[in-house]
């Protein structure tokens, strides 16, 4: 499949995994050595940089518990070289851009979330 088809499939599955609130399904997309940057992480765990799959599981597990009505609506996606950006709206109506970098096996090794005001 071409990069655009792969990016579209990833974006749709990623949003579906979040909307299912399935932490294992969400984390299956990420490499063990993931580095994740998010202003929300800074609020929830005191650090905007989350390193490693265990730390990411702990953070997102806590975040899911804090947001029982969490729901993402996919707006669009952009494909790049071993990278993509997912643009979505969260359950609070806030727009979020999640940019990810993939390794050669298609796992996310670096991700950053940027939020609209």
Task: For each feature predicted by the language model, list its residue ranges.
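Short, hydrophobic secondary-structure boundary micro-motifs
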Residues: 27, 37-38, 72-73
């Amino acid at each position: 499949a071409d990069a655009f088809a792969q990016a579209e499939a990833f974006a749709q599955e990623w949003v579906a995994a979040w909307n299912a609130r399935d932490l294992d399904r969400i984390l299956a997309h990420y490499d063990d050595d993931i580095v994740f940057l998010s202003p929300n992480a800074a609020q929830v765990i005191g650090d905007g940089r989350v390193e490693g799959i265990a730390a990411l599981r702990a953070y997102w597990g806590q975040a899911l518990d804090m947001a029982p009505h969490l729901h993402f609506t996919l707006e669009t996606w952009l494909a790049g070289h071993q990278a993509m950006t997912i643009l979505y709206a969260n359950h609070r109506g806030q727009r979020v851009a999640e940019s990810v970098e993939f390794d050669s096996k298609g796992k996310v090794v670096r991700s950053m979330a940027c939020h609209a005001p």
